[in-house]
Curated annotation (Swiss-Prot):
It comes from the Bacteria. UreD, UreF and UreG form a complex that acts as a GTP-hydrolysis-dependent molecular chaperone, activating the urease apoprotein by helping to assemble the nickel containing metallocenter of UreC. The UreE protein probably delivers the nickel. Keywords: Chaperone, Cytoplasm, Nickel insertion. The gene is ureD. InterPro entries: UreD. Pfam families: UreD. One of its GO terms (cellular component) is cytoplasm. Required for maturation of urease via the functional incorporation of the urease nickel metallocenter. One of its GO terms (molecular function) is nickel cation binding. This is Urease accessory protein UreD. It is found in: Cytoplasm. Belongs to the UreD family. Its main location: cytoplasm.
Length: 278
């Protein structure tokens, strides 16, 4: 159920701690600790025993002022973990700050895919997201996030509030990616050509590894109406960005890249989780 963008005051802390281990050819959860309304559904092995998929759910349906979400996932050696969500995360208008802390740790020989659906930040929300990712040895990462500011379909611009995000990725303690974002409601950057250029949605994709020029060009040729995006190959990390008119279009662009990059960098064809189709 979609709740109205009212001014919420109660706070609701929630924690979720996940860990995975490899047993023979099978990746299995070995720790599932939760506090408050954060949960995971029963794990799935839709691609076979090697890949363990978990769907993270937040039954309240939205995050409001004073809420604190703390999520951690540890992919043990040689595991393959895929984490996604059943729907958009909604950050509601509120008088206080709401915060999410995400910590991902990926051990040598392991693969972690963080593939949530979009984050919708309502006008008047005060949303702060902090993400730390630690890779060890030859660990592999496929990470994306999609952020929609306001609700353009409801003619709601992001005229007040703020969205703030911090993202750090390290391999064996060495910093690979360091990013800080802050967008305030009504800021000129929302419409500036050096900012969001009037687009309400932006998305980021980070993939460990390097691709050749041919595959990079194939990725750049992905054409989704209403999306402007590009990719950059850094040392050991591929970065993709886009601006979009709708969250669904940004997600379609990311999925198209995932279909191209997953076989090349992770050695497995892309199989969309069934929850994305419901």
């Amino acid at each position: 159920m979609n709740l109205p963008a009212a001014l919420f005051t109660p706070s609701w802390p929630a924690e979720l701690e996940l860990a995975y281990a490899r047993h023979g050819e099978r990746t299995t959860p070995v720790r599932r600790r939760h506090l408050g309304p954060l949960r995971v559904q029963k794990h799935l092995h839709a691609e076979g025993p090697e890949v363990c998929q978990h769907i993270i759910v937040h039954p309240p349906g939205g995050i409001a002022g004073g809420d604190r979400l703390d999520i951690s996932a540890h992919a043990g050696e040689r595991t393959w973990v895929q984490l996604t969500s059943p729907g958009a995360a909604k950050w509601y208008r509120a008088a206080g700050v709401a915060r999410q802390d995400l910590r991902l740790r990926v051990e040598a020989g392991a693969t972690l895919e963080w593939l949530p659906q979009e984050t919708i930040v309502y006008a008047g929300a005060q949303a702060e997201l902090h993400t730390q990712i630690e890779l060890h040895g030859d660990a592999r990462l496929f990470y994306w996030d999609i952020v929609a500011l306001g609700r353009p379909a409801a003619d709601e611009r992001f005229a007040s509030g703020h969205f703030q995000a911090a993202l750090d990725v390290r391999r064996d303690g060495r910093l690979l990616w360091h990013e800080r974002q802050r967008v305030s409601g009504g800021d000129g950057l929302l419409d500036s050509p050096i900012g969001l250029n009037g687009q309400p949605v932006f998305a980021t994709l980070l993939v460990s590894g390097e691709v050749d020029n041919e595959l990079l060009e194939r990725c750049r040729e992905v054409n989704i109406d209403g999306v402007r995006g590009d990719l950059s190959q850094l040392a050991g990390l591929l970065v993709a960005r886009c601006l979009a008119s709708e969250a669904l279009k940004a997600r379609a662009w990311l999925i198209a890249l995932w279909r191209l990059l997953r076989p090349a960098l992770l050695g497995r064809e892309a199989v969309p989780p069934r929850i994305w189709s419901t």
